């Protein structure tokens, strides 16, 4: 079954992609949730025309995402957390990284930040997906909170 995605679906594709999925997944989940619609021949023609019109706008969006990526790399992120020696009491997740970025002046949704769960102090990297073509590696440091 071929479907046209209306929005980004994790592990499947991006908005306006034509994807092939099993019939049950399409009929019972993607279409009822509003994530996709049937890829008929007329829908494919309309999609092709829309993509042509959107191509030049997309170039500007990619350039803006790259500029934002450069700004993110310039921010030095230090997250302080309670720790006993090297081990943290709790953990640092993408939510904490998003909050640290917001304090640095860049608001990024936590869904676009990919980072493992960190339970020790030290330096780590996280991936930030700003656009389907722009993924930035972000360095951050976890330090023990001073009591």
Curated annotation (Swiss-Prot):
Assigned keywords, A-Z: Ribonucleoprotein, Ribosomal protein, RNA-binding, rRNA-binding
GO biological process terms held by the UniProt record: translation
Cellular component, GO, one term: ribonucleoprotein complex
Molecular function, one GO term: rRNA binding
Superkingdom, natural source: Bacteria
UniProt keyword Cell inner membrane present: no
Family: Belongs to the bacterial ribosomal protein bL9 family.
Function according to Swiss-Prot or TrEMBL: Binds to the 23S rRNA.
Cross-referenced HAMAP family: Ribosomal_bL9 (MF_00503)
Name assigned to this protein: Large ribosomal subunit protein bL9
Organism annotation: Flavobacterium psychrophilum (strain ATCC 49511 / DSM 21280 / CIP 103535 / JIP02/86)
Gene responsible for this protein: rplI
